Structures are given as structure tokens and as C-alpha cells.
Amino acid sequence: MNGDVIHVAAGSYVPSVPLTGMKTALDNTFEIHSNFSMIGGYPADAAEGAVADPVANETILDGDHAVCHVVAVTAAKMNGMKASLDGFTIKNGSSQFGSVGSTTIGGVKFYQSYGAGIFIGNATVDILNCKIVDNTDIRMGAIRVDAGAEALFDNCVVADNATKSTTTYNCGGLWADGAKLLRINNCTFSNNKASGVAPCIYVFGDTGGKTNVLISNTTISGNSVNPEHATLNGGGIYVRENGNLVIVNSTVYGNHSGKGGGIAVYGTAAKPSKAVIVSCTIAGNTTVTAGNGAGLQQAAVGGAIEVYNTLISGNTTDGAADDVAWFKDASYKVANSIIGGTVYNADGMAVAGAAFDPASMLSPLGDNGGATKTCVLLGDANPARQYGMSASELKILGETLDPAFGEAVSAIDQTGASRTGKTVIGAVVK
């Protein structure tokens, strides 16, 4: 019922009831059909007053490699209400080859072949302190966030998900299509794979229209197109038609694809896309095809990019620097940022006498405090410590963007350290 709270003890649970409108065992799912909360992580022998601890008391929603969606969120939107899922491991969802059945709930088609871990329809939902791991899908992600959805993923891990086939099926991690607003905060996306484009995060309003995504304080690492393919884009994030991304205080590291190993942006005149990148570190990403932006790729004239207070360096193709590829005549802006070895001021002009060396001035990905792994700056004479934006400038910028972020985000770095009194480029001020 709406408003209910369900407390779940540690253990492994397999769904046994089909999704509304479906009939087969393949369609069995844990359906969040109303705006209630489910909280996992309680001891198996919990007594009155027990406190949830999902690390000590793992609570698993297990598809057992036999269901299309482990969790389906179908709750109708209601003013002042939302569904929530807190403290669960969601694993072993397995959408099937040849599965083309669907049911329509709240105006959204729940296809069997989409969203093996979680399928979010036209609902308002918080996914908190969850692990979404080891799900396999034909296409469209271990997580599917569909048209009209308003969803938050906070303090979650999305890892080791994959598409099944060596045929080019897209997106092993999360696919947002038509989301009214998807927010991702304090999350880790790692080691997701796809045989097509966007092995990790796909922001593509393919059928659902404009898709709004805000990513903050998140690390996206080690995701890859597999098997390797020279022309497939977006190892970490791929923003396509109708996609609208703002990413802030985040690290995109060690991802791999044919082109645009870290982030790729593609749009058309009829269906433009946009990515705004603020206070991020994009490093250690690789591509197969040289000259196509191992760190950041602008793949078409309809894909606009704005880069602020961001470090993009140490990205390579076959060992050679290949940080950014701009598309001819496309719209882009760079301010208070570093690309490769060049430092840019607020007007997008190179700073004379300032140079950045990723080998000696930036650490590999590691544990540096905070909820996620990051890279830290090395050396006191590092230009990334000098030419960035102030906390007040970042506050003003964040409030003007769409989706916007407030001072709670702009005033700190990815680890939670204060930006006050500093003008540091990148995700971490240390």
C-alpha cells in the first residue's frame, strides 16, 4: 500500500509472482506497484529496535538467471509520495534471447529484453545503498529508466553487468530513455560491458523524448566495449539524441571503447544533445581508433559540450595522447580547465607558461577518502591548483544549469572536502 514500510531480513529472495499483465515464470519480479518503502539489511533474527546494516546483513533480490527484471517499479506518481528501495543487492537478472513480450503500465512498455536488474517506469523512486551487479541483458541495460521517471540512485554500486551477445547490443549498465530527471550521486559504476555502444551509462531519448540526467560525486571506471570494436562509442558515458547531461564532481577513469573512451556526445539537428561537465577528472581512458577522443569525443554537430573546471588528461590511443576530439562546426566551450597539457583560462584561452603533465601531476585511481575512488593532484607547483573556478563561481554556475545543482554540491569536491578558498581544477582538491 502507499506509505507502507517493509523491513526485510538478511537472506536471498527469488521472485515468484509475474509482473502485472504478464503470465510466465520468466516475468516473475519484485514489483514495486505502490509508493511504499522496502528496507533491507536487518539481521535474520531481528528483534524490535534492530538497525539495518546491509553490509553486515546482505539482503539479496536474486533473479537466479531466470527472470527478465529482478525489480520492476510501476508505482503511479502521486503528489508528495515516492517509492524507495534501500539496502539491497539486486543480481542475476537475465533478459532472454527472443524475448519480445511486453506489458504497458502507466504508459510505459515493460519489454522483457530491457532492464534485467531494475526496470523503472513512469514512477518516482529512490534507490539507496544498493548494489546492482551480475545482471545480463540482451540490450538496454541492467537498469532501465524510462519515460517520465523521476529517480535517484544514491550511494549505489552498479558493477559487472553485461550484454549477452557478441552481436552489437548496447548498454550493459544503465540506460535512461525519456527520464524526467535521473539523479545519480555518490555512486560507483565499474566493470560493466556491452557488445555495442555505451557499456556503462547511456543517455538516449530514443523513444521517450528528452532525457535529463544529473550525475554528482560519482566514479565511472573500468567499463568497456567487449569484444573490442573500432567504431563503437562511449566507454564511460554516451549521450545521444535528446540526451541532456550535467556531470559534476565526478571521476571518469580507465574506460575503453572504439571512440570516446570516457565520454562521447552525439546529436542531430532534429534531436540535439548536450553535456555539461563541471569539476570532473577524466583520465586513463583509452580508445581503439586514434583521433576520436579517448577522454571526450564530440561525435556530431548536434552534440553540444561545455567544460568547466575540469581536468581531461592522460587519455590515450595505443599509448599516444588522445584526450579530446571536437567535431567541426559543433558547439563547445572550455573554461578554467585542462585538456592534455594545456591550461585554459575563463575565456577559453591557453595560459602562457602553464603546462600540465599527467604522468607526474595526477595519481592513478585510488582510495583518497569519500565514498568513491578518485585521482588526486601531485606536486605543489601543479597548475591545476591555481587556474580553476572559486566556490562562489561554481555556485553561480550550478544554479544556472538544467538540471541544476546547488551549493551542497558546488561547495565541496568528490571526497567531501571544501572548495572554499581554493581554485582547483578537477574532481578532488587535495
PLM feature spans:
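C-terminal accessory segments
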Residues: 65-75, 348-430
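Intrinsically disordered, low-complexity Ser/Thr- and acidic-rich flexible linkers and loops
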Residues: 98-112, 165-166, 206-209, 226-230, ...
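Predominantly extracellular beta-rich ligand-binding scaffolds that present long acidic/polar faces
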Residues: 3-5, 9-10, 16-37, 47-54, ...
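Solenoidal tandem-repeat scaffolds enriched in leucines and small polar residues
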Residues: 162-163, 172-175, 189
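Active-site-proximal beta-strand/loop segments in catalytic clefts of secreted hydrolases
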Residues: 9-11, 41-42, 64
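Extracellular beta-strand-rich solenoid/capping regions of secreted or surface-exposed proteins
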Residues: 16-37, 46-87, 91-124, 138, ...
